[in-house]
Regions:
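Conserved N-terminal beta1-alpha1 strand-loop-helix module at the mouth
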Residues: 1-69, 73-77, 88-101, 107-115, ...
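A short, hydrophobic beta-strand element within the central beta-sheet of small alpha/beta folds
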Residues: 140-142
Length: 172
């Protein structure tokens, strides 16, 4: 059964009480005061908290979050970036790594041993992404995730461990 990471896109703390959501993703570009309030409330409820965005490592460290989801898909030196994150955040931090939707890149990023590998999914080309995720899960022990980049994406048909949705899309 898929687990959900819900990306918080608006100042809404009501999802913290949803027992089906175990992990939240805070955007480093969002208001820091809100991120701090949300993190405190989510921590009290026993939820995991990750950060994303350009300043994800800094936000993670500042607020004492559990880890980050970092986009390595555009990075020409992903190993150096990943090693920086591991050193900056510590060995116990959770790191989810977004990869390009290609087998070679998925294998390369997996060599760094992230906690989970994130594939990006759009409605256009969804079948190719489904096939890629299925192939990946057949070969690797690292958990896989899909990051829904569009609304109304049929994520239920993915053979993945984790689905990352925005708070607008999470309506289960």
């Amino acid at each position: 059964m898929q687990k959900f990471i819900v990306k918080i896109t608006s100042e809404n703390i009501s999802l913290i009480d949803d027992s089906r959501v175990e992990c939240f993703l805070l955007d480093s570009a969002a208001d820091t005061a809100f991120n701090r309030r949300f993190a405190e409330a989510a921590r009290k409820a026993g939820k995991l908290l990750l950060s994303c965005g350009d300043k994800a490592p800094e936000l993670c460290r500042e607020l004492g979050l559990d880890g980050v989801v970092v986009d390595l898909s555009k990075n020409e030196k992903p190993k150096a970036e990943f090693q920086f994150l591991r050193n900056f955040l510590g060995k116990d931090a959770v790191i989810g790594a977004v990869t390009r939707n290609r087998r070679h890149e998925a294998m390369v990023i997996s060599e760094f041993e992230p906690d989970f590998l994130v594939f990006q999914a759009w409605n256009d080309g969804i079948e190719q992404v489904r096939e890629l995720v299925s192939w990946y899960n057949g070969l690797f022990l690292i958990q896989s995730a899909i990051l829904c980049r569009e609304e109304n994406l049929d994520y239920a048909g993915f053979d993945c461990d984790i689905v990352i949705l925005s708070d607008r899309e999470y309506t289960i």
